[in-house]
């Protein structure tokens, strides 16, 4: 995982995200280790909100998997936790990052944002 390369990849994310303020997506400073759906002042989709209530924490591994397919990740998480009835709708995040190394690098960068 290379945080410097991840910072370059993160430029794609800046359409919707910033480190220090909510935009279309939530602020990402401190996201690693944060409970899903809890960035202050951000209005989350029900899918994200329910995932946080069901115990989803944004570990580096979870974010790497999430970035490949956000909706599929959250729906699987809720279903695996016995909350299939809440695994409906969609997250606001429609972007998918297919390249696994880029996902690892961007998460390494996110981990530096405090």
UniProtKB/Swiss-Prot annotation:
Pfam families documented for this protein: Cytochrom_C
Subcellular location: Periplasm
Biological process (GO), any one: photosynthesis
InterPro entries: Cyt_c-like_dom, Cyt_c-like_dom_sf, Cyt_c_1A/1B
Sections of the chain in a coiled coil: none
Superkingdom of source: Bacteria
PTM sites of type Pyrrolidone carboxylic acid: 1
Record-linked SUPFAM superfamilies: Cytochrome c
MF terms (GO), sorted A to Z: electron transfer activity; heme binding; metal ion binding
GO cellular component labels: periplasmic space
Keyword Transferase: no
Keyword field contains Iron: yes
Family according to the record: Belongs to the cytochrome c family.
Name under which the protein is recorded: Cytochrome c2
Organism of derivation: Rhodopseudomonas palustris
């Amino acid at each position: 995982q290379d945080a410097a390369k991840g910072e370059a990849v993160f430029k794609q994310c800046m359409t919707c995200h910033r480190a220090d303020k909510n935009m279309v997506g939530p602020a990402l400073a401190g996201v690693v280790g944060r409970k899903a759906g809890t960035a202050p002042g951000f209005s989350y989709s029900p899918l994200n909100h329910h995932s946080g209530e069901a115990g989803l924490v944004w570990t580096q591994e979870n974010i790497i998997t999430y970035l490949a397919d956000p909706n599929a990740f959250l729906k699987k998480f809720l279903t695996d936790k016995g909350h299939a009835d809440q695994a409906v709708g969609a997250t606001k995040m429609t972007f998918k990052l297919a390249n696994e190394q880029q996902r690892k690098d961007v998460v390494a960068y996110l981990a530096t944002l405090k």
